[in-house]
Design a protein with these regions (language model features):
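Short alpha-helix carrying the canonical HExxH Zn2+-binding catalytic motif
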Residues: 62-78
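Metalloprotease/metallohydrolase-associated module, dominated by Zn2+-dependent proteases
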Residues: 2-32, 38-48, 83-140
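Activation segment
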Residues: 55, 77-78, 122
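Short, aliphatic-rich beta-strand segments
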Residues: 49-55
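Short helix-loop capping/hinge motifs at secondary-structure junctions, enriched
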Residues: 58-59
């Protein structure tokens, strides 16, 4: 993928739309490179309708890649649902509350309700694609 911003391919939009009712996936733009202000070393980062991927992480040709895209699309839906500033405030508040409870960084991050929801979407897409793949292989 180029460093330029681009739309999700039509096939990806068609594949993921049933998993995200109420979200117009044609509005989503993707680009390579995580913004410098993002803490840590994420493979993906969503900001409203824009998704940033670490170099090489944006893969529309693998089940894992499509599942990662679904994870980030879930965050786009969360932004739409809560608004940008409210989403960010709640996200950070949940993280810091988890840290104050004594969780290490990774556990605090993974316990953020927004991340739990995004992982559920990621896993749902992964399972659906694996089932589809199995059915396809059985027909061969």
């Amino acid at each position: 993928m180029k460093r330029d911003v681009e739309s999700l391919p039509e096939e990806v939009v068609a594949l993921l739309t049933p998993f995200f009712p109420g979200l117009d996936l044609t509005r989503i733009r993707v680009c390579e490179g995580i913004p410098r202000y993002v803490v840590g070393d994420p493979v993906g980062y969503a900001d409203r309708y824009r998704i940033y991927f670490a170099p090489g992480a944006y893969r529309v040709d693998t089940i894992e890649g499509l599942s990662l895209i679904a994870h980030e699309v879930a965050h786009c839906l969360q932004y739409q649902r809560h608004g940008a500033w409210r989403f960010r405030a709640r996200y950070l508040a949940a993280y810091f509350k988890n840290r104050l409870r004594g969780m290490n960084h990774l556990k605090a991050y993974r316990s953020i309700p927004f991340e739990v929801e995004a992982r559920e979407a990621e896993e749902q897409v992964y399972r659906a694609l694996k089932t589809l793949q199995s059915g396809l292989l059985e027909t061969l």
